[in-house]
Amino acid sequence: MFNQFKRLIIGKPKRHRELKNEKISKFKALAILSSDALSSVAYGPEQILLTLSIVGAAAAWYTLPIAVAVLILLAALTLSYRQIIYAYPKGGGAYMVSKSNLGEKWGLLAGGSLLVDYILTVAVSISSGADALVAAIPTLYSHKVLIACLLVLFILLLNLRGLTESATVLSYPVYLFIVGLIVMIIIGTFKVATGQAEPHMQSAVGTAVPGVSLFLLLKAFSSGASSLTGVEAISNAVTNFKEPGPNNAVKTLIAMGSILGFLLVGIVGLSYWYGILPQEETTVLSQLAKHVLGQNVAYYFVQATTVMILVLAANTGFTAFPMLAASMAKDKYMPVMFTARGDRLGYSNSIIVLGVLAIILIILFDGKTENLIPLYATGVFIPFTLAQFGMVIKWIKGREKGWAVKLIANAVGGTITFVVFMIFLITKFNQVWPILIFLPIVVIGF
């Protein structure tokens, strides 16, 4: 009876020789591995505005230079992870880079940070999706935590059925979200260029605003940098790509970075033009869609796809966590159970463990996204920083052709990500202090 139920839910077992058929194309990989990063535009620009609004609406123009700074950081991270993919074609990302160049303990810190971050990816994304859902259907509010837990179980079961099936199902909502936002930005830009959209800026660029300090701007920048969570996922899953894996992974990474940069700049720029400010009962993205598209079918399409991608962003964690756990298990830092493939050739044990831990987090934090995001964003900048400086050491030791330019790029990127991490730590210490306790325990446990 149990086996029959298992086959109904998960599907028939696959032979190991079918593993090569589990490799995914660039088209599917962009959806399955980029949903986390791309979905962050739904809250990243809003986080910048929320921070600046402390000193008043006139400070909104600072979102423009801050968005440019985030774009520069995105370019640095994309370049860094492009180099990491070619240097470490078997995957592992920041874990392999740190372990190989900085030493075992730093590698374990990077690996532990990423594992924790992937758990938080699932918890944050699912909680955000549940928030959006209950906002649309208020009668479900009292069941928000239960809804979030059920959504985790749905994504968990989808991944237990196998990677290719998961990628096929999840690719459609992600591309609908991308197309919806790109069309919205193009229409909005056209209206601005042709004078159809009256400017409602809160203040002109360059306006001196009392209360704005370097500390506030850095805090706003770090909040905006939450839009970059998930950028590293592709480097951890190179072996999931069809051959040639590294080349396909790099092309997917560049496509993701380009789309993310376009969406971020478009949303920030149009939000400034329309004078949009954060409101308690709605989101910045929702306000922008309403201004540009009107409250019609197109508006609800953007809202619906936003909800879907926030939920499906959790799938990035379900893809990257098992790959990283398998790499660390092969290095004897985690139980061998994490290297075992299930009936459908996925790392079933990792998938189940990740789902259970994410559900526990959602219950502990009562599904409150605002309390999870600081931990989430802070944790991801640890492996970002270690990966960058690990590559710096690699270039110094190897001194291969073009090493100086690569070294400078990684050194600048590493410095920026370290500064962002410290800003998070200092400005939001009361929310992120568990990172300082939990990560050392994880490393010692390895």
Model-derived regions, located:
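Membrane-interface "cap" regions at the ends of multi-pass membrane proteins
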Residues: 1-55, 79, 90, 98-105, ...
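Hydrophobic alpha-helical segments and their helix-loop junctions in multi-pass secondary transporters
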Residues: 176-203, 267-275, 385-400
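Extracellular loop-to-transmembrane helix junctions
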Residues: 3, 49-99, 104-111, 124-151, ...
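C-terminal membrane-solvent junction of multi-pass transporters and transport-like membrane proteins
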Residues: 30, 337-349, 384-429
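Membrane-interface loop-to-helix entry segments
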Residues: 155-190, 254-255, 373-386, 405-416, ...
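TM-loop-TM module centered on a large, flexible mid-protein loop between adjacent transmembrane helices
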Residues: 103, 255-313, 338-363
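Helix-loop-helix junctions that connect adjacent transmembrane segments
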Residues: 175, 179-229, 427, 431
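Loop-to-transmembrane helix boundary motifs in multi-pass membrane proteins
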Residues: 104, 144-149, 240-263, 327-363, ...
